[in-house]
């Protein structure tokens, strides 16, 4: 989808910037241990997620200045719907191997 600028990576917290190109997207994935909060710095995005309590898929457009919180065990995908964009991510730490792909971005 672009690249990641990881500026801090610790056991209890982490921070990175996700940089996207036009119409780039992430895999539909989830984490069992990692919670994430995103702040849209630049560009417009669509976040899609599955609510595992009702099995339904939801989506929300994210514009600059918007914050979105992604809880653990919540499958999600981010798509850039503008020419380019970037999102700041804060999380509750690095947990190796804690990303599980539901659908590859090529099939979304």
Predicted regions and their residues:
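Glycine- and acidic-residue-biased ligand/ion/polar-headgroup-sensing regions
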Residues: 22, 32-52
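Conserved hydrophobic/aromatic beta-strand scaffold that supports enzyme active sites
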Residues: 15-19, 37, 59, 67-69
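Residue-level marker of beta-strand positions
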Residues: 25, 67-69, 75, 86
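Short acidic-glycine-tyrosine-enriched beta hairpin
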Residues: 51-73
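Short, surface-exposed beta-strand-loop junctions and turns on beta-sheet-rich folds
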Residues: 34, 53-55, 93-96
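A short glycine-rich, His/Asp/Glu-containing loop-to-beta-strand
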Residues: 1-34
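Double-stranded beta-helix
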Residues: 60, 77-108
């Amino acid at each position: 989808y672009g690249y990641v600028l990881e500026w801090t990576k610790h056991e209890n917290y982490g921070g990175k910037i996700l940089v996207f190109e036009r119409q780039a997207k992430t895999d539909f994935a989830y984490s069992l241990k990692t919670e994430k909060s995103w702040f849209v710095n630049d560009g417009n995005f669509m976040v899609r997620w599955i609510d595992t309590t009702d099995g339904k898929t939801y989506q929300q457009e994210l514009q600059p200045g918007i914050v979105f919180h992604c809880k653990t065990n919540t499958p999600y995908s981010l798509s850039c719907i503008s020419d380019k964009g970037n999102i700041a991510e804060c999380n509750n730490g690095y947990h190796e191997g804690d990303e599980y792909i539901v659908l590859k971005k090529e099939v979304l």
